[in-house]
């Protein structure tokens, strides 16, 4: 069983990204950069405000999650989570990788977006693995931090410090 897990993790680490320069920091945390034209794509399509870091909370594919993360569509708990963090200079959005469920989400939420042109799925290969969520933070230079799976307040603060050039 241990060998199967090790093989899965090795394959997962090779498949987590496509079209981005990426380094693996730990089992589920990645850092890297995307080119300027991809930053421009994000600003154009996801209401990324000038002078801010973009925080993206992903709800991944139903097929990659052992539970239905779309059962609860309301994200009030997530809004409260970010409000308590009191982060400055951030644009916070949510991406649904399930297009057929997106219509339900966008009726009540203006900060939910589709994965336009499969940008995130193709660039970061979020179809791989068995996870329900992913968290990404990107600065305007294109440097990013990505955590696949569950995340904590500490992850968000660490990502923010790293992208500002500080040590967490």
Tell where the protein language model's regions lie, with residue ranges.
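Bacterial Sec-dependent N-terminal signal peptides
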Residues: 1-25
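Non-catalytic interaction/Regulatory regions outside core domains
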Residues: 19-168
């Amino acid at each position: 069983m241990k060998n199967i897990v090790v093989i899965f993790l090795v394959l997962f680490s090779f498949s987590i990204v496509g079209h981005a320069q990426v380094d693996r920091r730990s089992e589920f945390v990645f850092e890297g950069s995307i080119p300027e034209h991809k930053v421009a794509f994000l600003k154009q399509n996801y209401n990324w405000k000038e002078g801010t870091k973009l925080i993206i909370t992903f709800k991944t594919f139903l097929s990659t999650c052992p539970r239905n993360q779309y059962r609860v569509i309301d994200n009030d708990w997530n809004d409260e989570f970010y409000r308590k963090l009191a982060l400055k200079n951030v644009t916070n959005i949510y991406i649904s990788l399930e297009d057929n469920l997106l219509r339900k989400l966008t009726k009540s939420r203006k900060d939910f977006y589709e994965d336009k042109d499969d940008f995130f799925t193709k660039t970061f290969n979020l179809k791989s693995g068995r996870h329900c969520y992913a968290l990404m933070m990107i600065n305007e230079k294109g440097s990013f931090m990505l955590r696949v799976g569950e995340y904590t307040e500490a992850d968000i603060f660490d990502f923010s410090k790293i992208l500002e050039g500080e040590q967490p």
